[in-house]
């Protein structure tokens, strides 16, 4: 870590071999707090691996909580959210992902992309969830959330018990 004396903040710097330069990793946002690319800012896409065909695509998350109220009111749900993490798919055909900035673990039907459920998270899910089964037969989905970084969040591991059918 190195301190940026102008801004009074610490940043992670990485040296670049063979050059006298260093790199500062950060998320590039506009002065209003919006990403510097046109929407959508995040989507979840299902692809048929045999044909390469896109089966469905849905907006993933929302990031209105990071914006001033006036700006957040202009954000549309279909824009999605920047995200950090990936999905898992259960044997029952449910896709779980919590990578967006909206503080939800989402569950989608793998065939249609329809959202089946969402569970609240104390911070943004910035990891890929995992699924496990305990000796009693109950199945859980867990995800690490938070992790500091550019959005200054806490650290948690959250688990949800899945309903048996």
Task: Tell me the role of every PLM-derived stretch.
Residues 1-165:
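Beta-sheet-rich non-transmembrane sensory/scaffold domains
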């Amino acid at each position: 870590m190195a301190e940026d004396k102008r801004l009074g903040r610490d940043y992670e710097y990485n040296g670049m071999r063979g050059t006298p330069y260093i790199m500062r990793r950060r998320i590039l946002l506009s002065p209003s707090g919006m990403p510097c690319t046109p929407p959508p800012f995040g989507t979840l896409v299902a692809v048929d691996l045999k044909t390469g065909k896109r089966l469905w695509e849905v907006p993933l998350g929302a990031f209105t909580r990071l914006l001033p109220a006036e700006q957040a009111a202009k954000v549309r749900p279909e824009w999605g959210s920047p995200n950090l993490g990936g999905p898992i798919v259960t044997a029952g055909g449910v896709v779980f992902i919590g990578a967006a900035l909206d503080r939800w673990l989402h569950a989608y039907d793998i065939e249609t992309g329809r959202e089946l459920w969402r569970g609240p998270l104390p911070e943004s899910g910035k990891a890929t969830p995992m699924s496990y089964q305990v000796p009693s037969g109950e199945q859980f989905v867990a995800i690490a959330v938070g992790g500091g970084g550019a959005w200054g969040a806490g650290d948690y591991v959250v688990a949800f018990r899945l309903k048996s059918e």
